Amino acid sequence: MEPEPNVWAHPELRTAVAAEDWPALLKTWRKLTRSSQSKLGALVGLAQPDISAIENRRREVTSVEVRQRIIHGLGVPLELVGARYEELPLPSLVLPGVVSETDAERLIAVKQGGLRLDTASLDAMDALLAAHRRAEDTVGSRTIISLVTAQFEEVAALYGRARGPLADRVVKLLAEYAQFLAWMAQDQDNAPVALGWFDRSYDWALESGYGDMAATTLSMKAHLAWSQDKGRRCVRLGEAAASTAEASEATRAMAVQMAGRGHALEGNSADAYRRLDEAQQIIAAASDTPPWLYFYGESWFAAQRGMADLHLKEWSSATENLLTGLAGFAPSFRRDRAWYGSCLAHAYAGAGEAEAALDASLSVITDASEIGRPHAWEELHRVAGMLIRRRAPEGRVLCDALVALD
């Protein structure tokens, strides 16, 4: 049998939407589209166990955030949702204190055309974007990328209403959203989409004279090159970012360390450590940091140096630097802890410390599975392969643990 051609015409599905019966909605949608819980979860940013729990009524859908993800991810026609969706000023996670009731009312009025776009409205949007950047550290990109895409669309719709300095500020906000969306696409190993968003971010940054964002976009393209094992391209993009006009010292430091990582990938240890040292000197003297570089600090630089050590097979210093970096990461940085924890396991495995490699792997395996796919998850698979090739029994233990979560 072929899937139902227009599922939203089906009376059962329309009834479920009208009643906000989320378990029935998910079950009926899957039945009509012949979809698995995993496929549905990927569309709405939920793991398969979460979909199962909702469908079996073991978990209630109570947050605005999850409702929005279901509506947006499944393409629920807004006429079925009605005013409940229109009342939302911007799609948002439920984050206390991010948008006050006054700001929410203001954003609703701006969206409906009853109030002119003003500085206070843009301040509220800035706060929302900043909060979601931090939330992504904890819940991962898969969970919120559709949500942030919806936010971007709302902000883009305001461009035609902005005048004078506000117009430039809207373009800057669009550049920040595009950079964040590019980062999340890259985090999900979707390079073509990431490059498209990076290009849009760079164009908007140039249009609005936003040197920090223009440099950041080039730095993130360097990061993408690094993730594809293109060391030479990583170096060149990092150096281009570092020379961008009107970029702050903090942004230059990020660019210089990217060049250093590219040199490490190419096996050029002297150039790698020289640029990494220079990046730390620059950031130490920096007085202003753009809001999207909130994670900057000694812990982050130690972790980056550990990454360079890994490329150069300096296992002892890699272990030391990664341990230092991880010790300074807040618990909310789940994605970063999963990634750098898996790199620490790699360093231990490279040094022949199989037991330590297994312990490091198991300490982050849950976060790697839940929010660290594909990068941290694939790194743990590489660690298992290294251990198995060395005939260490810990390799089979790790492999079995990974299979259990696959």
What are these regions (language model features)?
Residues L115-L122, D126-D406:
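Conserved binding/catalytic microenvironments
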Residues G45-T62:
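Recognition helix of helix-turn-helix/homeodomain-like DNA-binding domains
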Residues A42-A47, K172-E176:
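A short glycine/small-residue-enriched secondary-structure motif
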Residues L26, Q37-G41, I51-I54, V81:
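Conserved hydrophobic/aromatic packing and binding residues within compact polymer-binding modules
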Residues E20, H72-A127:
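Compositionally biased, long intrinsically disordered regions
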Residues M1-E2, G45, V64-L80:
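DNA major-groove recognition helix of helix-turn-helix/homeodomain DNA-binding modules
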Residues R30, G41, I71:
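The alpha-helix within a helix-turn-helix
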Residues M1-T33, Q68:
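A short, Lys/Arg-rich alpha-helix, primarily the initiator
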